[in-house]
Amino acid sequence: MPLITNVIARQILDSRGNPTVEVDVLTESSFGRAAVPSGASTGIHEAVELRDGDREVYLGKGVLKAVENVNTVINDALEGMLVTEQTEIDKLLLSLDGTPNKSKLGANALLGVSLACAKAAAEYSGLPLFRYIGGTLANTLPVPMMNVLNGGAHADNNVDFQEFMIMPIGFSSYSDALRCGAEVFHALKALLKSKGLSTAVGDEGGFAPDLASNEEAIELVIEAVGKAGYKAGSPTNAGGLGDAHVMIALDPASSEFYDTDKKKYIFKKSSGQELDSAEMASYWENWAGKYPIISIEDGMAEDDWEGWKILTDKIGSRVQLVGDDLFVTNSIRLADGIERKVGNSILIKVNQIGTLTETLQAIDLAKRNGYTSVISHRSGETEDSTIAQIAVATNAGQIKTGSLSRSDRMAKYNELLRIEEELGDEACYPGIRAFRV
């Protein structure tokens, strides 16, 4: 029987050189390992990432308290449990913590254990993780959101918006879509060089040059699509897709430039322009009418429900509106958003909520209510590629895992190539069918 014999945690480093938690789960006949990611722009409603706070060690970012919680409290509680009982394991983890935001033991401690248990169970069952979680119907490779140009909190430049992404929607296989993304990435690098702009990359592998405006960022990306030999779509209000190979996705991370006292969106890094909620929604409406934008994530701030409603009413029928800081992978906040009719998609970050079971519950709630799900990395990543497995397991249809550089990002893309190969003729790449707008 696959009884848990030992749960071991250690402190490792993520892609930004900051400590994070890695967990090994051992049973009598299997093994699972998971490393926990960490965000730079984090929502205030996220589960708590437990840090040591000792400024003399790793600038206060150590995770030895979380590691100790795994090696003592959690290890003692899980010893002897069936590793295949994921729901019961996650229930026990939540009860051991006992707080609504996982602040006692740390969401980073709980998540590492939860994912490592799932991996150990999959190994015991002789199945890849995507098949163990998703069953025989798990066969959809996700359309990637490829973050090729960075601004905001992810880059030291003068661009307010955090991520400018390409989505290769006009292809019949994941491998062809990945090739498109790589070629556009290299075309963008050459384009930036030709203009004397920096090709240094941000946290997620996208370029981070100083530009004249936020508009220049999206225009450079569209130009690079053409230079790579692909066709960008038209604005969605003009028919949009046709025979397009690539559409644009944005993550402005609007909470990062929202002033809660003034109730204004302030473009602090560029023009200094100040917009209220209605004006910010109109700003995105204008962009969606001007550029081939298929998806906007966090177009409004995390608690600006009124702004979200205005934005959804304006463009929600033709643009995917993804809630990240708004929903934080939390079924309670998602249910609230569904009731209010705001957004039409949820970003899924496993470390925002803290257990695999809660993650799957959020995805299921979204599906049952016509919302799409985008499985996502964090800006602080590791070589762990679990989210690639989860994307296929849930048939989510979309994944957001950075640019076409940095091995912590490529680990996920390459894992999806392996899964596509394993699925063979069963593999499905949805392209534009991944969207419901």
From Swiss-Prot:
Pathway: Carbohydrate degradation; glycolysis; pyruvate from D-glyceraldehyde 3-phosphate: step 4/5
Cofactor(s) in the UniProt record: Mg(2+)
GO molecular function: magnesium ion binding; phosphopyruvate hydratase activity
Binding site for Mg(2+): D251, E297, D324
Catalytic activity: (2R)-2-phosphoglycerate = phosphoenolpyruvate + H2O
Residues that bind (2R)-2-phosphoglycerate: Q162, K349, R378, S379, K400
Signal peptide, first to last residue: none
Gene Ontology annotations of biological process type: glycolytic process
Residues at the catalytic site: E204, K349
Keyword Secreted: yes
Entry GO CC: cell surface; extracellular region; phosphopyruvate hydratase complex
Keywords recorded for this protein, A-Z: Cytoplasm, Glycolysis, Lyase, Magnesium, Metal-binding, Secreted
Cofactor note: Binds a second Mg(2+) ion via substrate during catalysis.
Enzyme class: lyase
InterPro entries: Enolase, Enolase-like_C_sf, Enolase-like_N, Enolase_C, Enolase_CS, Enolase_N
EC number, as in UniProt: 4.2.1.11
NCBIfam families (alphabetical): eno
Its job: Catalyzes the reversible conversion of 2-phosphoglycerate (2-PG) into phosphoenolpyruvate (PEP). It is essential for the degradation of carbohydrates via glycolysis.
Similarity remark: Belongs to the enolase family.
HAMAP family for this protein: Enolase
Name of the protein described by the UniProt record: Enolase
Organism of origin: Prosthecochloris aestuarii (strain DSM 271 / SK 413)
